[in-house]
């Protein structure tokens, strides 16, 4: 796809397309100019030429030949990759928004550093030892030298078996200074980490052909990116994402690398890398052709240079010796499917096939390298395969992918047997190129399983550019858990995946994979193609495609996409549609009490939070609308007053209808309403709608109650017991401002039945039954009526009178006087105080404490 994209930068783009069949069929992106000079043909950026808008990010998978024994290290790297993936995801999101021009400027910034590195690397391109030192530096693959440098560095790193060359080579758009070098590096490093489990990955962001010299490898880089492309297949599809260009480069790199590097024994690691690198040169024909034809086979420098030209691509290839074969095969498959979509890729396919062929001759060389880091490389290779299938398969998923799979299978074979060579032997030189389809059935299947295993690793890389965060997290862990995740697709895959992460298992995984691959390989290939195309289609294409590699077989492609989706704002849970808000829920809201608290919240914080809530959840806003009106009518947006006890408190503390401060008040009110007669009932109904009415009602009731008490007290006690109790209660409500006494003042006289609804009613009922004490109570009521309204102002005598007024507490009142308990002390009393200090029994103590609590509340 990227090859097809018009490349404004250099003729290299045209060359890439036109010279697809150029020097090495492996390099679909051969630049006409690069046919001879290979590296200088930096214009090969043509691959990226399509990428300019895509913010091409090349992941140079450094196939550091890590010891398989370092399983723990491998896991750590995977975790680190996951962690960095988060950072990378952020950077990737930012980069996606960056214009290609910005990416190019970034590339230019990095190119400056790369130029120096390249010069050094160009001289030391032949020497892989030089590469490592240079690899550490950020190499802009803008120039072939830089690409070589990266390739060498990666090759060296892989050869050195150093950890992931975390030198994320940010071959960013040379002209895009907009991206900060640190950003690019972070992004690259994160992606590198992603690949790290399989192999050291250097992330190169070759933007357009700013570094035309380096861009020549771009086709190869594109394929390298292919590994990343899976990460960002969708991105590649979109102009900004360099992924797709990357894919071609990956495919291309493997092709030339396969054929060229293998011949060079010294480059055995390089061969692993070189094969990728060679394939990369094949990809970037201009850059790689010389290497393919001359350097690729015999001269390490050539292959190195080819890598350099593909510096990004090569590094990835080098980084993944196994990947190189895998890429060669994988990319061939994808290239075959994508020949129509991308000339580079189709050629890559052929070249990559040759790579295996060429690699076969130097099996020992390749094997050492591959075996040394076979697991990492294998994993990385698989990723590249998976990536390319995903991203490139997107272009021509079904038909081409199957051919690509054969290549992948060979790659898998190579890796499994102990080198890409083995795989290649399975595929004849002509067979791979012409017979991708032939090889597809067997090797593709294995390859595919590898791919699935690899895909997990690659997926992390690809997700970073697009919605990689979730995907990557899953993928990165997947690398470990990939076997399980992938296992869903096929047990063989799972075994392969496990083996690959382990690194040592790789040899066995090859064995496992071949048969499963044969069984499921073809199906996987189609599934992969199908899934890959969806991945490209979807915004989450990167993660989708990477998943596609593994999930295609499972048919998990869509679910993984859903999982990958970073911003899932709507959920359906048990039939309820739940929408997430872009911001955290307000502190005041409790999401558990849907009805009550939402109403409370609507009234309490609606004025402040309503706009936010409307945006937050449709459900909330819908539920709150009715209560909004209610709260407006009440006119108490922040604070509400309980209609029963008159307590003023924050609206969110009020229950349900916002009219009562507690469930007790609501129950008492409801019971009272059923028994109440006209005056209060109509008054209450009005109070529901007007907050001011509440205060008025309270005042009116208080004003009207004292006369009642005086009148009732004048009446004979025996004749009007209920009236007396009512009067007492009303006086309590006035003086104590106790909501419970207030409630009973309204309800008790009219409805003795309601006594059971509350503690105060029970006490009232007890009082009604205690007719013998009625006279005393009446006297107490007379004295009590004159108590100060605020309990804190009571003196000892006031407290004494208050306690005497309580049922059954006449004798205890003396104890209060003896203890000199005034109003303040009374409010501080607890049951244990009463029981321990005054030797009061539990029953009376609880009653007294309940009355004291009512005083406090009032």
UniProtKB/Swiss-Prot annotation:
Region (Interaction with BMI1): 33-53
Region (Disordered): 1-76, 230-307, 337-388, 407-444, 473-493, 529-561, 688-720, 732-768
Additional note from the record: The hPRC-H complex purification reported by PubMed:12167701 probably presents a mixture of different PRC1-like complexes.
Cited SUPFAM superfamilies: SAM/Pointed domain
Gene (UniProt): PHC2
Binding site for Zn(2+): 642, 645, 661, 665
Compartments (UniProt record): Nucleus
Renumbered ranges of motif HD1: 558-587
Cross-link Glycyl lysine isopeptide (Lys-Gly) (interchain with G-Cter in SUMO2): residue positions: 598, 600, 632, 702, 847
Zinc finger residue extent: FCS-type: 633-667
Phosphothreonine modified-residue sites: 619
Name of the protein described by the UniProt record: Polyhomeotic-like protein 2
Sequence ranges of Basic and acidic residues compositional bias: 473-483
Function: Component of a Polycomb group (PcG) multiprotein PRC1-like complex, a complex class required to maintain the transcriptionally repressive state of many genes, including Hox genes, throughout development. PcG PRC1 complex acts via chromatin remodeling and modification of histones; it mediates monoubiquitination of histone H2A 'Lys-119', rendering chromatin heritably changed in its expressibility.
Disulfide partners: none
Domain SAM: 794-858
Biased composition (Polar residues): 265-274, 379-388
MF GO annotations: chromatin binding; DNA binding; histone binding; identical protein binding; zinc ion binding
Amino acid composition bias (Low complexity), ranges on this chain: 10-34, 230-241, 337-358, 537-551
Organism: Homo sapiens (Human)
């Amino acid at each position: 796809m990227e090859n097809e994209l018009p490349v404004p930068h250099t003729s290299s783009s045209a060359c890439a397309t036109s010279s697809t069949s150029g020097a090495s069929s492996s390099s679909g992106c051969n630049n006409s100019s690069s046919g001879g000079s290979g590296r200088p043909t930096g214009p090969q950026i043509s691959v990226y030429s399509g990428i300019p808008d895509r913010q091409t990010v090349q992941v140079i998978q450094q196939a550091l030949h890590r010891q398989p024994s370092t399983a723990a290290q491998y896991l750590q790297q995977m975790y680190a990759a996951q962690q960095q993936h988060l950072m990378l995801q952020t950077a990737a999101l930012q980069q996606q928004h960056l214009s290609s021009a910005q990416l190019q400027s970034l590339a230019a910034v990095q190119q400056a550093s790369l130029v120096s590195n390249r010069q050094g690397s160009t001289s030391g391109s032949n020497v892989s030892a030089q590469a490592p030192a240079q690899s550490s530096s950020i190499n802009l693959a803008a120039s072939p030298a830089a690409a070589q440098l990266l390739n060498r560095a990666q090759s060296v790193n892989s050869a050195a078996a150093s950890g992931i060359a975390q030198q994320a080579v940010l071959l960013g758009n040379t002209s895009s200074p907009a991206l900060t070098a640190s950003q690019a590096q972070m992004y690259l490093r994160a992606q590198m980490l992603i690949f790290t489990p399989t192999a050291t990955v250097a992330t190169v962001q070759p933007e357009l052909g700013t570094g035309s010299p380096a861009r020549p490898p771009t086709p190869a880089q594109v394929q390298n990116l292919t590994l990343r492309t899976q990460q960002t297949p969708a991105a590649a599809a979109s102009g900004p994402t360099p992924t797709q260009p990357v894919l071609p480069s990956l495919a291309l790199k493997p092709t030339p690398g396969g054929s060229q590097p293998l011949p060079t024994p010294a480059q055995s690691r390089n061969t692993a890398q070189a094969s990728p690198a060679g394939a990369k040169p094949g990809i970037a024909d201009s850059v790689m052709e010389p290497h393919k034809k001359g350097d690729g086979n015999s001269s390490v420098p050539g292959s190195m240079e080819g890598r350099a030209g593909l510096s990004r691509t090569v590094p990835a290839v080098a980084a993944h010796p196994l990947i190189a074969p895998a890429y060669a095969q994988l990319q061939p498959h994808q290239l075959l499917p994508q020949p129509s979509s991308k000339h580079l890729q189709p050629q890559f396919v052929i070249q990559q096939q040759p790579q295996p062929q060429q690699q076969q001759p130097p099996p020992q060389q390749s094997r050492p390298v591959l075996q040394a880091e076979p697991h990492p490389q294998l994993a990385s290779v698989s990723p590249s395969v998976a990536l390319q299938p995903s991203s490139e398969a997107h272009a021509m998923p079904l038909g081409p992918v199957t051919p690509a799979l054969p290549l992948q299978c060979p790659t898998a074979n190579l890796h499994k047997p102990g080198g890409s060579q083995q795989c290649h032997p399975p595929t004849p030189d002509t067979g791979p190129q012409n017979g991708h389809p032939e090889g597809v059935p067997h090797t593709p299947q294995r390859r595919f399983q590898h791919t699935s295993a690899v895909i997990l690793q690659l997926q992390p890389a690809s997700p970073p550019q697009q919605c990689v965060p979730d995907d990557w997290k899953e993928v990165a862990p997947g690398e470990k858990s990939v076997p399980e995740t992938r296992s869903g697709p096929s047990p063989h895959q799972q075994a392969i995946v496990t083996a690959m992460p382990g690194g040592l298992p790789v040899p066995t995984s090859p064995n496992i994979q071949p048969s499963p691959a044969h069984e499921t390989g073809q199906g996987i290939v189609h599934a992969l193609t199908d899934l890959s195309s969806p991945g490209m289609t979807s915004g989450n294409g990167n993660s989708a495609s990477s998943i596609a590699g593994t999930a295609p077989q499972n048919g998990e492609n869509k679910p993984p996409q859903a999982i990958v989706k970073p911003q899932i704002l709507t959920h359906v849970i048990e039939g309820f549609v739940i929408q997430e808000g872009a911001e955290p829920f307000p502190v005041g809201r409790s999401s558990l009490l849907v009805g009550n608290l939402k109403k409370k919240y609507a009234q309490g914080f609606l004025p402040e939070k309503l706009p936010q809530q409307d945006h937050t959840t449709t459900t909330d806003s819908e539920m709150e609308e009715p209560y909004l009106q209610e709260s407006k009518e009440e006119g108490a947006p922040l604070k509400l007053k309980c209609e029963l006890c008159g307590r003023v408190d924050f609206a969110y503390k009020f229950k349900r209808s916002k009219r009562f401060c507690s469930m007790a008040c609501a129950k008492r009110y409801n019971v009272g309403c059923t028994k109440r007669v006209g005056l209060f009932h109509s008054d209450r109904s009005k109070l529901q709608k007007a907050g001011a009415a509440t205060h008025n009602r309270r005042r009116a009731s208080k004003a009207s109650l004292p006369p009642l008490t005086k009148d009732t007290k004048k009446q004979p006690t025996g004749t009007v017991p209920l009236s007396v109790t009512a009067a007492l209660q009303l006086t309590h409500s006035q003086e104590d401002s106790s909501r419970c006494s207030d409630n009973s003042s309204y309800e008790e006289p009219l409805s003795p039945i309601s006594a059971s609804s509350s503690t105060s009613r029970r006490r009232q009922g007890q009082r009604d039954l205690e007719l013998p004490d009625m006279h005393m109570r009446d006297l107490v009521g007379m004295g009590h009526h004159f108590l100060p309204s605020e309990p804190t102002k009571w003196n000892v005598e006031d407290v004494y009178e208050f306690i005497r007024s309580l049922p059954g507490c006449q004798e205890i009142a003396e104890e209060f006087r003896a203890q000199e308990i005034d109003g303040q002390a009374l409010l501080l009393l607890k049951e244990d105080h009463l029981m321990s200090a005054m030797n009061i029994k539990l029953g009376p103590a609880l009653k007294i404490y309940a009355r004291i609590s009512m005083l406090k509340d009032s």
